[in-house]
Amino acid sequence: MEHLNSLEHHFLIAMPNLTESWFDKTVIYIVEDNEHGTMGLVINLEHNLTVPELLDHFELTVEAPENYADQPVLMGGPVDLEHGFILHEPQGTWQKSLPLRDNLAMTVSEDFLKAMADGTAPEKIVVCLGFSGWEKGQLNDEIQANNWLTIPYNEALLFDVPNDQKWQVALNTLGISPESLSMDAGHD
């Protein structure tokens, strides 16, 4: 079976055959895809917490309440739900930050949360609890089984499109409507 190139800095789009799973109509940003496996963050499944409520949980006083006022925290995936991951742009210099591509970074440090509370963090953020993970080769097998479509990174999809529209918009970038999708793979 032929293996796909690295999917880092791409999006996965859930296919209709995942409707009975945790990943129903999800879009996932792939943070890492290497010889150890794949790690991604769901960018369109909302948690019941908002960003200000999360900051309050850490006893951080929000000095700029208009920042992120109604922004929901997202469910990044079913793994490690008590850990937070923040995708943001620009990258900046945070304590525990992983620079990605296109001036995007993922940060997991409290100094970023403090910057969010005091209004000095970047405006473009996506806050997730938990992540999605696959063992080496597992995601490639799922793509071959027609569980996922892939598209390159798109800043607007990550930061600007409303969460409830991201799946549809992601499909539209491929010229696909949900009604035209089949659950059958197009190969043997």
Curated annotation (Swiss-Prot):
GO CC term, one of those recorded: cytosol
InterPro entries named among the record's database cross-references: AlgH-like
Family stated for the protein in its record: Belongs to the UPF0301 (AlgH) family.
Designated name of the protein: UPF0301 protein Tcr_1827
Organism expressing this protein natively: Hydrogenovibrio crunogenus (strain DSM 25203 / XCL-2)
